[in-house]
């Protein structure tokens, strides 16, 4: 019998034993956290617009210096091809999933601030001071994808899949994921899943429908990655509206395959823009053998307040008062990091 999951009744506030990392000395300001944590505060600026940025910044450039860093990523998208090669893909919906292998250069540490994307001021970009694309190759066969996995796998065969949020161009998603991968110091093979967003604050409803449009494609990507012998561990990192797409894809996989692949071990949801009632149902339908979920939430997230208003006043998972739901979240094996207070609540994985 399925266990009832209730987010509607707040639980008692946590005792001191529940609080693992606490208050005033928030560790997120330290250099170590800046370079190691995957999502906070690296994702905080994702929702912002891109006014004033040059277009067509993805045209590959040549570099003559060796002091830059490189991130080699596989990019899967349901976007429509753009007419300009410097844009690659637009915000409109494509008819099939497309794969590209991109190499992004990141300026030397002395020329940038950790946690930020140094956007090109003009085209072509200056790799010494700005993010730039060094290589763009179309991946048109399964063998090419397998070759990429083998080239980029680490000793533990770890993969990280990033699903961006609302209001992102293709370039936004590519540069931001490159920044997260580099600044987190991870050597997991990076895969970006980017869905059709019109990159407009007025495009919320179009973007939401685009996540539904892209659900099956993300399911297929996760399943194919899990089936690869070159992959041993998958972490999924999603932000904002991308968390809805991620949760729906995992739910769909569980229903199609009867269970979520065991290789999908960690799912990180940053500022999840998901109706709390819907999230409850998604968790139930994922089944008992779910991955370990970590949620970054804040009652001060203004973007989620707007989403809550648009969605009929129903709380978003990323905007709930986590201290009021400690017991129920722990019972579900969910770890919560409250970014408004820097409190961390840990729970064992449902698979433990």
Regions found by a protein language model. Give the residues of each.
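Short beta-strand element of the alpha/beta-hydrolase
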Residues: 158-163
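Serine-dependent carboxylesterase/thioesterase catalytic core
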Residues: 51-63, 78-79, 83-99, 103-105, ...
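Conserved small/polar residues in nucleotide/adenosyl-binding loops
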Residues: 345-352
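Bacterial N-terminal signal peptides that target proteins for export
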Residues: 10, 23-38
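Bacterial N-terminal signal peptides
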Residues: 39-46
